[in-house]
Amino acid sequence: MIRILTLFICFVHLSFVVCCQSAYWQQQVNYSIDVTLNDVQHTLDGFVKMEYTNNSPDTLRFIWIHCWPNAYKNDKTAFTDQALENGSTRFYFSNNEERGYMNRLDFRVNGTAAITEDHPRHQDIVKLILPHPLPPHASAKIETPFHVKLPYVFSRGGHAGNTYQVTQWFPKAAVYDRKGWHPMPYLDQGEFYSDFGNYQVQITVPQDYAVAATGELQNAAEKKWLMERQPPQPAPVSKKQPGAKKPKQVVTPVPGPVKTKTLVYRQDNVHDFAWFADKMFIVKTDTLRLPSGRVVTATVYYYRENETNWANSIAMIKRALQTKSQWLGEYPFNVVTVVDGGVGGGMEYPTITVLDDGGSEKSLDFVIDHEVGHNWFQGILASNERIHPWMDEGMNTYYDNRYSLQQYGTTNIDIVRSRSAFANNRLPDDLQGLLVSSITAIKKDQPIETRSENFNAFNYNIIAYSKTGQWMQLLERELGKPLFDSCMREYYRRWQFKHPYPEDFKKLIEEVSGRNLDNTFALLSRKGPIPQPAKRKDIRFAALFSLKDTRSHNYIFAAPAIGYNFYDKLMLGVLLHNYTLPFTRFQFVLSPLYATKSKQFNGIGRMSYSFYPGNRGQRLELAVAGASFSGDNFTDSAGVVHPQRFTKIAPSVKYFFANKNPRSTLTKFIQWRTFLIREQSLLFTRDTINQIDIISFPNKDRYLNQLRFVIENNRVLYPYRGELQADQGDGFVRLGFTGNYFFNYPRGGGLDLRVFAGKFFYLGDRTFLKQFETDPYQLNMTGPKGYEDYTYSNYFIGRNEFDRFSSQQIMMRDGGFKVRTDLLSNKIGKTDDWLIAANLVSPLPNAINPLSVLPFKIPIRVFVDIGTYAGAWKKNAETGRFVYDAGLQLSLFRNVLNIYVPLLYSKVYRDYFKSTIPEKRFWKTVSFSIDIQHINLRRWAPQIPF
């Protein structure tokens, strides 16, 4: 009996312990901070006192402390790495003056000196070792001085001149919750997670600064001054942004007095504190009475130049507060502040947000609604934004869309709406939904339940925000709007000022609704589209393009087309295609053209069908392309011009390999193409009976098989590309490797290195006839001319011209030299054996660029080419073993048109020019290339997945 009683007591005790451990708890961290701004050195000197209360069932022996200004300390931080991955080198190439840091920390815990240890990976996190363990339900007083050098505003916080955005600025405890510690480095893509507490902050600034901050201002005199002040007129000067290619207009305020003032702000039950200071702010304020009778003070801080868009900003804040209070629950704070601060982009903090107006009043309304809405999602419902960004950004987006539909009847507002009716009729009613559909259609989306830092930059906005908004709409449809609203209001009531996780949200929704929502919530962890009401598609014809209601229509677009070459002259026709978003599996483009000179119908076209066999963006494309134009002509003795036509058909198979890392900008593919080409040749025969010459244009057929393997990384820092290509035709095989590597310069531009190595083989014996027949396929030191474009893949104005300007066109292939020796029967550097070359291109430094004084930029570069080939290594070779050329290059239209002026070159080229071009030599040595076929959207925007 005693044993049974003992077991019973143990069981009851154990049950009690388990219940206690499973009960919700969260830490409380109160902050008292004194800080002084030095607006000459752009520094902060402060002292922080934390009252850390351990409400957990665990004894703590250390506390992780975030020192986030150290994210800007050097180029070896998580912030820097992510910025590079997201396509920005601004911080990476910034100088020490533009960077920031935090130092002079001297922690004491309950009056006892405490040591810190560095985080094993991140410079902006330290481990505070507690002198004495902190048991459950006990508190510790932690204090330290700190010094911050504010960086330029590369991300959310810092300064731009004397405009200050002071965010993530003080030593701050990381969260310890039921899932453990959550130390996290500062990231631009990826927000935060912090404990609730009560804040009292004293800010000392020069007295002519207007300050906006979290919480309620305690200085009555300052409130009066803000309402009565008139900001000074700005004195604009042009300053260059760190790491930027072009100077940006930044306002330099009129110098003010050196006297200071100390402002006191208080706010309970928040998890962060931010403040903003500028002498140029215009300040407006008003009040709003909520249904409960509580009065909220709404204030805006904006700049004079943006006054038109901000004129009704107070009304916008009021609408945001009213709708969110109605749909979710009443706004609990007494103040709400919105700050005009587009320098660092928008970001929300408790009771205050900084944002860009978006360029119009309507877009400002949209952004204010979104950022003020974050007071509910993450400000009050304080989920872990870094791990579960959908719980704040996505839920908030759902309510953005709901507000936009109610206020404007569309979710697009003015962000993408054009003043042109033509454009508006072609823009989608739901742009974000269209982008979600587009990314899921090609299987390059990611699950909604993905950590912020694991999204690529495109998906972070499309998935965490927009796709989650779609998922919330699905949840609303399943529950019905009244029940959905009841669930969300209960979620807010139960979890306000707490840290909900996804499982908490699911449990509550199922409890309130009485539904099993396993299938719906499972969608959060899956790729693919959110189920939408089914729609039948019809075929619709439209002019140019349309993104309107692509879920209902399969579009066929028509647009006028124009073309030109030397033989056909002007060509007019139509462009037919079905390219739109989301991409369809079957795509086509067809452009029939009528040539005004040759009086024949030409054209170009392509059809493809794509399969997506995996779940990581793999793609198998089957395609066929074709083209038919005049590639030459012949004028007979009677003056009749006979065009010589070429026609090609090129079936192909292309496979894009999977990319395991969605954030990677790496692309790999393998492609097989067969070119079936028919060319009209020129044939002279003699009629021996009638003693006349007969000219005919028989068709000649040939083929070429081509295998390519390409690996390309369009990362912003040191992008590269490598291509292996094997061509096989009648009697030969041609192998080539082309590599490109770009070395970035700190202030824009860089050194572009290209290398080529090629080898030519004969199948069977090498004969004079084979040498003659394979001449267009052989390796060239100089960029090949039109007749050497053996697959007709490049655009040439005069493909077979040997005089006038059109004869000076080359293509960037093989050795890539810019000097031409077209008049030689055996061009210098042409070989049917092997060839190696390197090409370097770099911007011309302003110090020696005479055109740098112009008010507009002319993209002049310097090129240098060096190479060798088999013939140079033979006995008694006419050239040295290595040849070179160098000169100036003018690159226009994103390098589509390049003009080359050789100035220095090997002796063999000098001798050629002297012997063949005795006078007016300069312009005849100029070359140019037109590289339309190399246009690649991903080189300009690597994060775009299309």
Regions found by a protein language model. Give the residues of each.
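Hydrophobic alpha-helical and helix-loop surface patches within well-folded domains
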Residues: R3, Q28-V29, E51, Y265, ...
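Hydrophobic helix-coil surface modules that form long, contiguous segments used
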Residues: A173-W181, G190-D369, Y398, K443
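C-terminal outer-membrane beta-barrel translocator/porin domains of Gram-negative envelope proteins
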Residues: P560-I562, N602-I604, Q618-V641, A650-K654, ...
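N-terminal, polar/Ser/Thr-rich
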Residues: C20-D45, A160, N519, P531-T550, ...
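Short loop/turn motifs that connect adjacent beta-strands in outer-membrane beta-barrel proteins
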Residues: K548-N554, P582-F586, Y612-L620, A658-I670, ...
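Transmembrane beta-strand segments that form the barrel wall of outer-membrane beta-barrel proteins
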Residues: N554-F566, L572-T580, T584-T596, Q618-S630, ...
